[in-house]
Amino acid sequence: FDGAYKIWGIQLDKDTFYKQKLPKEAVVHKINKKAILPTPKLVYGTATLKGKILDYQKEMMQQMKMHIESPALNVHNEQNIIKIKEDGTFQAEVKVASVTSVALELPFGWIECLIAPNEETSLIINTKELCRRQAHLQKKDKTYGEPVYFNGYLASLQQELASVDIDIVLKSVYYMDMYNDIAGKSADEYKAYVLERLPSIRKEIAQSPYSNACKELLNIQVDLAATGKIAMTERELKSAYITVNKLNKEQTDDYFYNTRIDIPTGYYDILKEFTSINTLKALYGKYYASTIYLISFLPNSLDVLKETLGTGQGPLFDNIKFNKLYQSIKDFTPLTAEQNAELKTFSSPAYAEMLTQTNKEIIKKIELNKRKTGFTVNETGQVSNEDLFPSIISKFRGHTLLVDFWATWCGPCRTANKAITPMKEELKDKDIIYLYITGETSPKGSWENMI
């Protein structure tokens, strides 16, 4: 079954085992060390990702997940499922507004790459080399080539990025260790802690043999990561205190909502060092989507960004606004007349085109949902908290129930709803009632449109 531990490619002849015939497309591109990082284009179009998995056998996994790290598509952790053909080839098309970082999830590792509108990214995935690099006993053995070969969109840069061996993670510790370290610290102490490695990382990038384009992108990724850490100051300090001191729910709520973390004047001035986050080139960064999400936890985030970056305009502000509108649409709340007017304020029509198309698709889904049958909406009535669940299920006594607690805003919940559809089809002749329960945190309008 999928996910089971399996061994492929066993070969008793050592010489035969070490022979590796690569396809002619598996080339290592020459790197131009002086190349600069090109400014990505903003245009709403189709990005194509295709490739081939070497040594693939049809009994292996027949599909893989493609995680899309777009500031829009990342809102609900959206994934594309890519079918793999019997010869190991695959192809996917995604609508995007600019360069977008994606990751392919495979049993033998994650493959990161860049896609872009009206461009094609082609991969040759060398399973033998990917597995060798992860094997404790074979890490120092002779290589079987590169783990991934890139062709098409920015192939040489993508190849170089895949080979980077600089650790640019600002604080590479288990989260509980970090919480123990920062619990009770001041904001300034937290900042010094999370940015401790920043100077040494910058120095290592500067002294590395990589191209100017690659170095620029690595520094952008450091800027994005650092911005996310600073944006999370209050939340991380509170979470650390709550976790380390093992507060119960009542104590947690009281501390989280009533405790004020003292943020010194000028605390966020450090963001002036990370101005690359407000450039189009930041869209190359694999942390871009998560950074925009983390910025949402920063109190008065737009005011802070305007003050520290010296402007209230630019790609970062466009994408924050884009993210908010996109999330509203994906929550089954079509754009209002006021929001439609707001589309004209974007610096590029690409954002408006993507939002308009997504809005049309949601309206179509809502209309289809209105025609659905085979379900009943039940009200709970006036029942005490203790009797609520027994009261709900008492209406279905004698039946097998599958109960799903979900919320309109919960990405994993909605992913799970889709995931069990094949199972429901398989069990449609069984006496099973599917009971979906949500609460007041789900806006009623969104809930009605979704069901």
Model-predicted regions and their roles:
Residues 405-422, 439, 443:
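Conserved redox-active cysteine motifs that mediate thiol-disulfide chemistry
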Residues 381, 448-451:
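Short, internal strand/loop/helix patches
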Residues 429-446:
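Thiol-based oxidoreductase modules, predominantly thioredoxin-like and allied folds used
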Residues 114-118, 390-394, 400, 418-421:
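Sequence context surrounding c-type heme c attachment/ligation sites in exported
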Residues 1-212:
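A non-transmembrane, solvent-exposed segment enriched in polar/low-complexity residues
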Residues 391-411, 433:
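Short active-site neighborhood of thiol/selenol oxidoreductases, capturing the structured segment around
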Residues 208, 426-430:
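Short helix-capping segments at alpha-helix termini
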Residues 127-399:
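Oxidative protein folding and maturation machinery
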